[in-house]
Amino acid sequence: MSPVHRSRTSQTQEAHKPTSTLSFISPPQPPRQDPKSPHILCSQPNACSRQSHVSYPNPWGLPCSQSKVSPPGTATNPNPKEWSRISGPPVSLDPQPWSSAPFKPTAQLPLLAQSLGPPAKPALPDPALPLQML
């Protein structure tokens, strides 16, 4: 029983040492992390980034209080057909735009590889050669 009591007393003494140092360091911390003052919270970079992640997406980069804004298409122009009338006729996107082009990269790649021939040797010599020469 005596070694158990000795270990407990040593643990309590070790536990009292960090609390004394923490009590010395802790008084300047509460005014920095006061949850009642949003100005101090927003001055910290982590606080604003957390709130912007909650109200994702936020492409405008607004502060925390103005992060909940509707997307550009819904706020100013609720009719999507007017956007197509303003920007012009809809453009049909070709899934393979090179299929109609005269230069087809897929057809030219084998010819390019044949014209180059075997792969060129590296500029640096083999590391085993200088050892053999020495």
Swiss-Prot record:
It is found in: Cytoplasm; Nucleus. Abundant expression is found in prostate, restricted to cells of epithelial origin in normal and diseased glands. Very low expression is detected in pancreas and ovary. This is Putative protein KRIP1. It comes from Homo sapiens (Human). Residues 119-128 have a biased composition (Pro residues). Residues 9-24, 43-55, 64-79 have a biased composition (Polar residues). It comes from the Eukaryota. Induction: By androgens. The keyword Cytoplasm applies. GO terms for cellular component: cytoplasm; nucleus. Residues 1-134 are annotated as: Disordered. Keywords: Cytoplasm, Nucleus.
